[in-house]
From Swiss-Prot:
InterPro entries xref list: ATP_synth_F1_ATPase_gsu, ATP_synth_F1_gsu, ATP_synth_F1_gsu_CS
Protein purpose: Produces ATP from ADP in the presence of a proton gradient across the membrane. The gamma chain is believed to be important in regulating ATPase activity and the flow of protons through the CF(0) complex.
Keywords: ATP synthesis, Cell inner membrane, Cell membrane, CF(1), Hydrogen ion transport, Ion transport, Membrane, Transport
Classification via PROSITE patterns: ATPASE_GAMMA
Pfam families (UniProt xref): ATP-synt (PF00231)
Protein name: ATP synthase gamma chain
Similarity section: Belongs to the ATPase gamma chain family.
Compartments where located: Cell inner membrane
Listed GO CC annotations: plasma membrane; proton-transporting ATP synthase complex
CDD domains, sorted: F1-ATPase_gamma (cd12151)
Major location category of this protein: membrane
Length: 286
């Protein structure tokens, strides 16, 4: 059994760690609330854009934009949104597992794959994994703007426009609630037709003055808004996962302190018993 002094030092060390994890839990909770506010503010715009684009994809247009045309999938691109920092449980691991599973299906069909990682952990993972990375972004912070993402997104759009990509997906952790964050893969290009719209009478549009100019601007703005929403959702998911992970670490530290305190008490008791035995033995010898 370790000595009482050694155990006491270990208890002090665990208590210091517990203070750190408790502080990180509170910081994550505060950041999560702010991230939720940003997510709630941008979600209606992203969903409205998705609805409008769903109608556009379903409608019969005189001008057929390249983003509406489905072509054979020979090259597939993934925009993978992960975190810049760790200590958020299995959030990134679960996301990467989902990407690799989907990637396996495309490779079995003979498709080539490119990655556009967003977030330091995503960049690090795909550098070690291998594969083509035409663009990446990291260090966006807790409150990125859409301007921080435009350059990265447009590299992937340019590749699609030039025929270097036939499919483009975004992968991120969708914030469901504080305890649940679900990794999702959403198709960006070609524009997916809305199932909801398919079951209803589709809208018809009259474009003024020129459908090409309008759609070129609208569809690029749509892609940018969906990527931005994915990043915002992932940040909220990151802070929620970190808060839960730090709470678990704090609780575990408390249990460890209690266990060590019991060991310390037993060590103290054994030391006192030994001292008393030595005193009694000495007195008997005299």
């Amino acid at each position: 059994m370790a000595g009482a002094k050694e155990i006491k030092t270990k208890i002090a060390s665990v208590k210091n760690t517990q203070k750190i994890t408790s502080a990180m839990e509170m910081v994550a909770a505060s950041k999560m609330r702010r991230a939720q506010e940003r997510m709630a503010a941008s979600r209606p715009y992203a969903e409205s854009m998705r609805k409008v684009i769903g109608h556009v994809a379903q409608g019969s247009l005189e001008y057929k934009h390249p983003y509406l045309e489905v072509r054979e999938a020979k090259r597939v691109g993934y925009i993978v949104v992960a975190t810049d920092r760790g200590l958020c449980g299995g959030l990134n691991v679960n996301l990467f597992k989902k990407v690799l599973l989907d990637l396996k299906n495309w490779k079995e069909q003979g498709a080539e794959v490119e990655f556009c990682p967003i977030g330091a952990r995503s960049v690090q993972f795909f550098k070690s994994f291998g594969g083509t990375m035409p663009a990446h972004a990291s260090g966006l912070g807790d409150a990125p703007s859409i301007a921080d993402l435009i350059g990265t997104v447009r590299v992937m759009l340019k590749a699609y426009n030039e025929g270097k990509l036939d499919r483009l997906f975004i992968v991120f952790n969708k914030f469901v609630n504080t305890m649940t964050q679900a990794p999702v893969i959403e198709q960006l290009l070609p524009l997916p037709k809305s199932e909801e719209v398919a079951n209803k009478h589709p809208w018809d549009y009259i474009y003024e003055p020129d459908p090409k100019v309008l759609l070129d601007t609208l569809l690029v703005r749509y892609i940018e808004s969906q990527v931005y929403q994915g990043v915002v959702e992932n940040i909220a998911s990151e802070q929620a996962a970190r808060m839960v992970a730090m709470k678990a670490a704090t609780d575990n530290a408390g249990e460890l302190i209690n266990d060590l305190q019991l060991v310390y008490n037993k060590a103290r008791q054994a030391a006192i018993t030994q001292e008393l035995s030595e005193i009694v033995s000495g007195a008997s010898a005299v």
